[in-house]
Amino acid sequence: MARYIGPTCKLSRREGTDLFLKSGVRPLESKCKAEAAPGQHGQRRGRLSDYGVQLREKQKVRRIYGVLEKQFRNYYKDAARIKGATGENLLKLLEGRLDNVVYRMGFGSTRAESRQLVSHKAILVNGKTVNIPSFQVNVGDVISVREKSKNQLRIQNSLGIAGQRADVEWVDVNTEKKEGVFKRCPDRADLPAEINENLIVELYSK
């Protein structure tokens, strides 16, 4: 499956906000020009139409979670079939991806790095190797680092970085054992306030 492998700052600048695609806890402004869009005329940010605002929000969320367009639309369709608010269901499905849970537990410093750990068979789910980043984690599942991968320097560094971030209330992590439990699905209040999932619902409802 195709993945974007270009400069991650360009994506954050395109959306005008930090998409947390880089490792570390420094704000985007200290890493690249956050205020300007990429390109020769990046300083010019025109006024967007309602459709443009909705599209940008969808692109922002899609890039945060590293999901391609077709897959993102499928997530939306699944979310619409679940009882409750479609937008909130969409975010919960994205949060339940294995690569995202690995990131939330601190084993990867970014979602891209976490996706690589999963693809390289460094992650176990309930004691079994799973190498599918989109694998949907269930409440109560135990996520752990494979024994032969536990001494990887990047995992050690990632756990150190994760210790500087805000606590993730819906996972319980044992950093010494390098394993964690997906305790519950996150509530909407647990997730970033700067995401407006209702704009995505409006976009796909047209």
From Swiss-Prot:
One CC-aspect GO term: small ribosomal subunit
Alphabetical keyword list = Ribonucleoprotein, Ribosomal protein, RNA-binding, rRNA-binding
Q: From the UniProt record, list the coiled-coil ranges.
A: none
Picking any one GO molecular function of the record gives: rRNA binding
Where does the record place the S4 RNA-binding domain?
96-156
Question: Which proteins does it associate with, and in what oligomeric form?
Answer: Part of the 30S ribosomal subunit. Contacts protein S5. The interaction surface between S4 and S5 is involved in control of translational fidelity.
Q: What is this protein called?
A: Small ribosomal subunit protein uS4
* Organism this protein belongs to: Saccharophagus degradans (strain 2-40 / ATCC 43961 / DSM 17024)
Q: Name the encoding gene, please.
A: rpsD
